[in-house]
Curated annotation (Swiss-Prot):
It is found in: Cytoplasm. Residues 1-79, 118-211, 225-250, 618-798 are annotated as: Disordered. The modification Phosphothreonine is found at T136. GO terms for biological process: regulation of GTPase activity; retrograde transport, endosome to Golgi. It comes from the Eukaryota. Signal peptide: none annotated. PANTHER family: RAB GTPASE-ACTIVATING PROTEIN 1-LIKE, TBC1 DOMAIN FAMILY MEMBER 10B. This is TBC1 domain family member 10B. One of its GO terms (molecular function) is GTPase activator activity. Keywords: Coiled coil, Cytoplasm, GTPase activation, Methylation, Phosphoprotein. The modification Phosphoserine is found at S22, S129, S644, S647, S650, S664, S673.
């Protein structure tokens, strides 16, 4: 064998030059290919022509006219002609050896000229795969990179075959087109080293052709077995994806599946897996960025600015709310103004769900009906409602992480709530405006709690809003239009002139409680005040929006027709929807429950005169949590130790409970300050049961002077506070009247100026016309006589 110069080595990297970046790992391709044991790349130098042999092919023996050498035997090259191949290790190879590899060779891209025969040459692009670390999962690429070197089917043995255990290669001689020229000696597989060294013999034995080329073979690790394989392409943003190799895509796909396949996030999934992957994907495209409210890609209508509260202030508010929860009945009955003030400041996010349940009294409703929601959920619903509900699920906040996925847990819980309500209230059924309301509740609390909160909204806060015919919302539209006449006469006059019915723009506002209109920060603040103060807040918010949209002459100049006005109402100004501005305007607007009830009576009377009786008669509307609390106390009066056992309310309540089959309440627990224990109740035969028994009353005969003085003081303070509140309300009404008067004067002044301007324009047009007629008139008489009387009158007129 001829001896030549030393083996070629890779040129050193320049000082300060960064190493070439490693591309992402690529797994093995389907079909026949060469594989070796996992580990770092191994570079082997051989002096024989190289060809690829697939695993399982019979390794040919040495034929006459060829030279058999060991893959691990280092050889020298006589010229700069080398061959670069990228191979993969065989899983059958022993996994006991680890080989270090230079970092400079990792990820190198080399252009190789392969000579498949002695006469023809083909040039192919070979991309060497980087070496993943231990435990790094590999993935099977979906398509083959252009120009990648692939393993061919087994070929017939040719002269110049090099056989090695675990790595078998064949190839011809080629010129190096680019890349690192490297030749290192390494052992691939378990090839026994030939102690005899290079083989040299007489003609007819295995000899290397001259000049001897150097074939540099880079071996990449093989993929893990299929059992431990995990496909990274199907991994969603919230959890692991579907394990297993990539399967062939089906011939027919749904629209969502096809979109997901095009976006590269969906493979052929089993039938029991959602095509959306996870709840944080929209149409198969994972969106990891969410705002603090859970909206993907930013908050709902993110153009508004959100107010930031210092952390210490937020913690203090949380402690105050927790203290109120511990004595809730006391706070509602005695210090409701403080509760209302704290609701207007904003309920802390961590306690908002609990506060909504306490304010609406849905917590007590849930405790009184244990297992009722599960019973309604198991019942069979009306198919006509269930079909409509299922169609509306994907329309509710599609950019929120709870409802982004088709069939996700958010849509499933929403379906359960709406279905249960149709069974709980079969006379009302389902209204499409209930879905966004239930969705907002689901964002803050579990399904069962959200259901009872929805029941309270539909029964106590907005009765009749979601019934057939929508008569209650039409009646409230008339009430709203009457209140608008007081709050903003200019907007009221414009809407009446354009003949725009209130139902055209306020239906979505009222029925969805502005959940689909305002920025999300403002929506939560409005809902906080709504649960505390009732429907009055909805009227106030709508009046503020209209006053700041159509309440001035400058704003009405762009709303000359009905279309322009409706377009303006669909695109409300951002300033009036901003959280702090909106809350400030709503709290200062002088619209009370008395106004609403007075207008309700007047509009109901007009309705009966023009349209007849209401088809659906809802229950009485309650204005906020205090009214709900007082109604609950009236329906269930507390039995204290001083109450008579034979009093009429007590007998009625006991009789009603006996008829209903409910167990009688336990006797009241005696306290230390309750006084002496009453003796046996003595009832004469002729004593009427409505009269209290003298022996059953354990109330002390008199109270101390200190207690009476404190009670009088408390009553006096309450009266003073009520007077102050009335005075402030009158002052606000006076200021509002002054503002309306000023607006009317401004409007009159502008109308006067407009008339003057039009008058001046008409005068100017008249002068021009007069001069034109003089110039176009007949020429003056040559004899110097006077003009005719008609001509004189014409000039005098103009």
């Amino acid at each position: 064998m001829e001896t030549g110069p030393a083996p070629l080595v890779a040129p050193p990297r320049r000082h300060g030059a960064p190493a070439a970046p490693s591309p992402p790992p690529r797994g093995s391709r389907a079909g026949s290919h060469l594989v070796v044991e996992p580990g770092p790349p191994v570079t082997t130098a051989t002096s024989a022509p190289v060809e690829l042999v697939a695993p399982g092919e019979a390794r040919p023996a040495c034929v006459p006219g060829s030279s058999q050498t060991s893959a691990s035997t280092p050889t020298t090259a006589t010229s700069s002609t080398v061959v670069m191949l990228t191979l993969e290790a065989s899983p059958e190879a022993a996994k006991t050896q680890e080989f270090p590899a230079p970092a400079a060779e990792t990820g190198a891209e080399t252009s190789v000229a392969l000579a498949l025969g002695t006469d023809t040459q083909k040039t192919e692009e070979v991309r060497a795969s980087p070496v993943p670390g231990p435990g790094t999962p590999t993935r099977t690429p979906s398509r083959m990179a252009p120009g990648a070197l692939t393993a061919k089917p087994p070929l017939a043995p040719k002269p110049g075959t090099t056989v090695a255990s675990g790595v078998t290669a064949r190839g011809g001689v080629g010129q190096v087109a680019g890349g690192h020229e490297a030749a290192t000696s390494a052992s691939a597989g378990s090839v026994p080293e030939d102690p005899s060294g290079p083989v040299t013999g007489p003609p007819g034995t295995c000899e290397a052709p001259a000049p001897t080329p150097v074939a540099v073979v880079t071996v990449t690790p093989a993929p893990e077995p299929v059992e431990n394989f995990q496909d990274l392409g199907s991994t969603s943003s919230l959890g692991p994806g579907i394990s297993g190799p990539r399967g062939q895509a089906p011939d027919t796909l749904s629209y969502l599946d096809s979109v997901s396949l095009m976006s590269g996030t969906l493979e052929s999934l089993p039938d029991d897996v959602s095509s959306m992957g996870s709840d944080s994907e929209i149409n198969g495209m994972a969106l990891r960025k969410t705002d603090k409210y859970g909206f993907l890609g930013g908050s709902q209508y993110s153009g508004s600015l959100e107010s930031s509260i210092p952390v210490d202030v937020a913690r203090q508010r949380e402690l105050k709310w927790l203290e109120m929860f511990s004595n809730w009945d006391k706070w509602l009955s005695r210090r409701f103004q403080k509760v209302k003030l704290r609701c207007r400041k904003g309920i802390p996010s961590s306690l908002r769900a609990k506060a909504w349940q306490y304010l609406s009294n849905s917590k007590e409703l849930l405790e009184q009906n244990p297992g009722k929601f599960e019973e309604l959920e198991r019942a069979a619903g009306d198919p006509k409602w269930l079909d409509v509900i299922e169609k509306d699920l994907h329309r509710q906040f599609p950019f929120h992480e709870m409802f982004a996925a088709r069939g996700g847990h958010g849509q499933q819980d929403l379906y359960r709530i709406l279905k249960a309500y149709t069974i709980y209230r079969p006379d009302e059924g389902y209204c499409q405006a209930q879905a966004p309301v239930a969705a907002v509740l689901l964002m803050h609390m579990p399904a069962e709690q959200a259901f009872w909160c929805l029941v309270q909204i539909c029964d106590k806060y907005l009765p009749g809003y979601y019934s057939a015919g929508l008569e209650a919302i039409q009646l409230d539209g008339e009430i709203f239009f009457a209140l608008l006449r007081r709050v903003s006469p200019l907007a009221h006059r414009h809407l009446r002139r354009q003949r725009i019915d209130p139902v055209l723009y306020m239906t979505e506002w009222f029925m969805c409680i502005f959940a689909r209109t305002l920025p999300w920060a403002s929506v939560l603040r409005v809902w906080d005040m709504f649960f505390c103060e009732g429907v009055k807040i909805i009227f106030r918010v709508a009046l503020v929006l209209l006053r700041h949209t159509l309440g001035s002459v400058e704003k009405l100049r762009s709303c000359q027709g009905m279309y322009e006005t409706m377009e303006q109402l669909r695109n409300l100004p951002q300033q009036c929807m901003q959280e702090d501005f909106l809350v400030h305007e709503v709290t200062n607007l002088p619209v009370t429950e008395a106004w609403i009830e007075r207008e309700n009576a007047a509009q109901l009377k007009k309705w009966r005169e023009t349209r007849g009786e209401l088809q659906y008669r809802p229950s009485r509307r309650l204005h906020g949590s205090r009214a709900i609390h007082e109604e609950r106390r009236r329906q269930q009066p507390p039995l204290g130790p001083s109450s008579s056992l034979l009093s009429l309310p007590s007998l009625k309540s006991r009789g009603s409970r006996a008829v209903g089959g409910a167990p009688s309440p336990p006797p009241p627990v005696r306290r230390a300050s309750a006084g002496p224990v009453p003796g046996a109740v003595v009832i004469a035969e002729g004593l009427h049961p409505s009269l209290p028994s003298p022996t059953g009353n354990s109330t002390p005969l008199g109270t101390s002077k200190e207690i009476r003085r404190q009670e009088k003081e408390r009553q006096k303070q309450e009266k003073d506070r009520e007077k102050e509140r009335q005075r402030q309300e009158k002052e606000r009404e006076r200021q509002e009247k002054e503002r309306q008067k000023w607006e009317k004067e401004q409007e009159k002044e502008q109308q006067k100026q407009e008339k003057e301007r039009q008058k001046l324009e008409k005068k100017g047009q008249g002068r021009k016309l007069s001069l034109r007629r003089r110039a176009d008139g007949p020429p003056a008489s040559h004899d110097g006589g006077d003009r005719s009387a008609a001509e004189a009158r014409q000039d005098a007129y103009f």
